[in-house]
Regions:
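Divalent metal-dependent hydrolysis catalytic cores, especially in the metallo-beta-lactamase
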Residues: 67-87, 102-111, 131-144, 161-164, ...
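Metal-dependent enolase-superfamily TIM-barrel catalytic cores that perform enediolate-based chemistry
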Residues: 116-168
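Histidine-rich, glycine-flanked metal-binding segment
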Residues: 4-45
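Active-site neighborhoods of metal-dependent hydrolases
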Residues: 126, 133-136, 144, 195-339, ...
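Surface-exposed amphipathic alpha-helices with a cationic face
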Residues: 92-96, 149-160, 230, 302-306, ...
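Divalent metal-coordination and catalytic microenvironments
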Residues: 12, 17, 41, 49-52, ...
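Metal-associated gating/positioning segment near the N- to mid-region
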Residues: 39-99, 115-121, 147, 174-180, ...
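Acidic, glycine-enriched loop/beta-strand segments at the rims
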Residues: 1-11, 24-27, 296, 324, ...
Length: 417
């Protein structure tokens, strides 16, 4: 995905999980005993990433395996876990060794929030402990005061671990930018930064991700925000699918609950999602027309990020309200194009951009020497972004997950739930 191009009549040779050769079908030679996967008329692209994933934060590995399967079945070959748990370190190791099937796993530690950080000193000690334990980064949730946040950020820089996630209301977007987030997720703090006098409001009044004050935004402030984000090299994980499917009035909760992908989730979970959306729509502050304008404002912010070279990463927040792991990544890609990105620009957010962000050149490209994380598609996603859903198979390093195998495993999940 380093260029917007299609290379016709290609053969890709994989050995021990790596691409060892690729080129014109008439010229590339390979062992006659090799397993041949017929991709005639199909399109091979790098595996996708879900950069705002949730792996169950529990002691039991079995629920984790189900979520990993859903990601892999949807062509997701890298995930960034945004709600860490001690057993996730073990899970990461078992995925790396091949003991457990799953995408490449980058994980945060347990959340830094208003409840988990009772003091500045406790927050600093949490940072040191998570760095020592081996987590890849720190996850920020709402509730931190600016003093506790400052202590956390200072210690994180001292010990060499990045932090990402929400922007606590008391911290605000400008302190967050100055502190040097690795990623800001959900466009958190963006709308507040556009609202004059936002300091006189409360988090509860504004609603989740400021959904109730979108009409107060002064869009002439957007260029200042974009410049600051670009200059500080702070990447964005919009999770627009969460807003479009949960907040938007035009998507009926019962209809969403009956979408085909919901059959792979526990019914209690889907019922909770349904009630969560219905309760939001009953909120006295909820105004359908205003929320539709808020959704359009979020799309504009995504478009402006892309236009102004603020790095974008693919992340939908799954599982979360009506976001089934893996499936929600395809929704997110579509919403990125709805925001004005081309299919190629949207695909970059889940491929080559991820490699740049993680400083791993093996992620997001198809070339000799890189890890074979690949997806075979029925059609060309550069002309129709919805083609990412039409998966013929997934190469997960040295494992080929055929369409037949994927369908069989998904059927098992369906029968369970």
């Amino acid at each position: 995905m380093d260029e917007e191009r299609v290379l016709p009549n290609q053969v890709v040779v994989i050995k021990n999980g790596k691409i060892v050769a690729m080129g014109d079908a008439q010229k590339i030679k390979y062992n006659k005993k090799a397993v041949v996967i017929d991709g005639k008329g199909k399109y091979l692209m790098p595996g996708l990433a879900e950069m705002h994933a949730h792996v169950p934060p529990v002691d039991d590995l079995e629920p984790m395996k189900e979520v990993l399967l859903l990601f892999a079945a949807n062509g997701v070959t890298t995930i960034r876990g945004m709600l860490g748990h001690p057993r996730h370190l073990e899970l990461r190791s078992k995925i790396q060794s091949g003991e457990i099937l799953g995408p490449r796993f980058v994980t945060s530690g347990p959340s830094f929030n208003g409840n988990s950080v009772p003091s500045e000193e406790a927050g600093a000690e949490m940072v040191r402990q998570q760095r020592k334990a081996g987590y890849d980064f720190l996850k920020i949730h709402p509730g931190l005061t600016k003093e506790k946040f400052a202590a956390m950020a200072k210690t994180a820089k001292e010990v060499g671990i990045s932090f990402a996630g929400h922007v606590p209301f008391d911290v605000g977007i400008w302190r967050a930018i100055d502190a040097g987030y690795a990623t800001i997720d959900h466009l958190d703090g963006f709308v507040e930064s556009l609202v004059p006098g936002v300091e006189n409001t409360t988090e509860q009044q504004n609603g989740l991700f400021a959904m109730f004050i979108g009409d107060m935004a002064d869009t002439t402030r957007i260029p200042k925000l974009m410049t600051a984000l670009r200059d500080k090299n702070i990447w964005q994980v919009p999770t627009q699918a969460l807003a479009e499917r949960w907040f938007a009035p035009g998507k009926d909760a019962d209809a969403l609950a009956n979408e085909p992908e919901m059959k792979y989730m526990d019914r209690k979970t889907v019922t909770n999602w349904t009630n969560t959306k219905k309760n939001l729509l009953k909120n006295a502050k909820y105004n359908a027309e205003a929320i539709n304008r808020y959704i359009l404002l979020r799309r504009k912010l995504i478009y402006e990020c892309n236009k102004n070279n603020v790095g974008l990463l693919l992340g939908s927040d799954g599982p979360q309200v009506f976001n089934v792991p893996g499936f929600s990544v395809h929704h997110e890609l579509k919403y990125l194009t709805d925001a004005g990105l081309t299919p190629y620009q949207a695909l970059r957010t889940g491929t080559v951009n991820v490699g740049k962000f993680l400083n791993n050149p093996e992620i997001g490209t198809i070339k000799k020497g890189v890890v074979a994380d690949l997806v075979l598609l029925r059609g060309n996603p550069l002309t129709n972004i919805n083609e990412t859903k039409n998966i013929e198979g997934v190469m997960l390093r040295n494992l080929w997950l055929s369409k037949k195998w994927i369908e069989k495993e998904l059927k098992k999940l369906e029968e369970k739930y």
